[in-house]
Amino acid sequence: MSTAKLDDSTQRPLYGERIIEESKIICFENPNKKRIYEISIQLPEFTCKCPFSGYPDFAKLNIIYQPNLSVYELKSLKLYINNFRDIKISHEEVVNRIMDDLVNEGSPHWIHLNAAFNPRGNVSMQLDIFSGQKRN
């Protein structure tokens, strides 16, 4: 292990931290607007902090949606989700905020967000939020 001193650059945010901090959900045009189909996205490494203890909370997020005019771009979604890692926020609030942002940015016909939080203190929690009307 090196014992070299670190320079001032350790005080500035690293490039990855800057990218995450500036992230937003980006969408692109649905390549087949006439077809009804579902897209499923898994984000297994979601983290935020408990607003009471400051301890990290971990969850697996699953998004299933029927796109309308646009589709979520996956890298931007990953970076947007990573932005919550240092935020002190309740499970209920963070999942509702994510759903609001997904609906506002992508305007899907229908969307379901499931957040399965890892157990802490022998208690686990799962939230399911739906928006829109599912089409067949």
Curated annotation (Swiss-Prot):
GO terms for molecular function: preQ1 synthase activity. Coiled coil: none annotated. Pathway: tRNA modification; tRNA-queuosine biosynthesis. Its EC number is 1.7.1.13. The active site is at residues 50, 57. One of its GO terms (biological process) is tRNA modification. Keywords: Cytoplasm, NADP, Oxidoreductase, Queuosine biosynthesis. It catalyses: 7-aminomethyl-7-carbaguanine + 2 NADP(+) = 7-cyano-7-deazaguanine + 2 NADPH + 3 H(+). Substrate binds at residues 72-74, 91-92. Its main location: cytoplasm. The keyword NADP applies. It is an enzyme of class 1 (oxidoreductase). It holds the Pfam family QueF. GO terms for cellular component: cytoplasm. It is found in: Cytoplasm. InterPro entries: GTP-CH-I_C/QueF, NADPH_dep_7-cyano-7-deazaG_red, QueF, QueF_type1. HAMAP family: QueF_type1. Catalyzes the NADPH-dependent reduction of 7-cyano-7-deazaguanine (preQ0) to 7-aminomethyl-7-deazaguanine (preQ1). Belongs to the GTP cyclohydrolase I family. QueF type 1 subfamily. This is NADPH-dependent 7-cyano-7-deazaguanine reductase. It comes from Prochlorococcus marinus (strain MIT 9312).
